[in-house]
Amino acid sequence: MHLKAAKEVIISGGAINSPQLLQLSGIGPASLLQQLGIDVQHDLPGVGENLRDHYATRLTASVEGVQTINDKAHGIKLIGEVAKYCIGQQSILKLGPTTVFCFWRSKPSLTNPDVQINFTPGTHQRGMQSTLEKKSGFTLATWQHRPESSGYVRAVTNNPFDKPEIQPNYLSDEEDQRVILDATKLCRKLMQTDALKPFQVKETYPGTAIQNDNELLHSIRDIGQSIYHLMGTCRMGPINDPMAVVDDQLKVHGIDNLRVIDASIMPTMISANLNAGVLMIAEKGADLVLGKSPLTMSGLQGQIT
């Protein structure tokens, strides 16, 4: 069976699937495609490169004299929380995973914050995010907004059902290491503020025995994890940029009637979760496909009610 597009093909597989699909279709780094026995349709070195993500680490602490989610998520107390939820009362089941957000500049010279810290009134067992600990505690999770470290996504066979190789290269850039270390140290300072002293806060991870930067960085690598903000693997850029994959119309360089519309086209990481940015890419991409002209300020005001 052969299927042909009447107008154009739109790929919206995300930062992992889109570059793999292009590579399997013969669009990507020629050396990789030849190694996999894939006929090269167009040598495009940037396909699968520039993978970026938000990498988070966390600090946990135990507390005394106050109930956290941990205390209410087990046994009879959990049944009570479910009952409260069912009758519309305040309950831990109505809480999101984060109740307080903090944005911080790791250097005074920065115009915008480059660090985010999330506070959660609970802690989970290591390696088991769905299982809360039984002792009272809280978590501070932190990550860098605009990491310089980048990795890649590469097909490993010519079989579309085989998963690609994903190498994010977290914290490979020295500036990223500085930022995450400074952010972690700030979290420690927040734990020791006067406002928290009545609750006898005791750091449980990485623990107060970990003090020098090398040890702290090791613990960050040990417990850190993706925030699932993967992007950049089909980056947008001008045709004279050897690593660019799509143009400003989201069309793949050198290929007719083929677009990529998803987070993979972002050339750099945004200072936020990706959801809003991806929604905007989708809205703009839809307008490009339909051939709509960009809105003017007067036209935009006419649409606001």
What are these regions (language model features)?
Residues E64, E81-G277, G285-T305:
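FAD-dependent oxidoreductase catalytic-site/capping-region signature
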Residues M1-V82, S91-I92, T296:
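Glycine-rich loop(s) and the adjacent beta-strand/alpha-helix scaffold that form part
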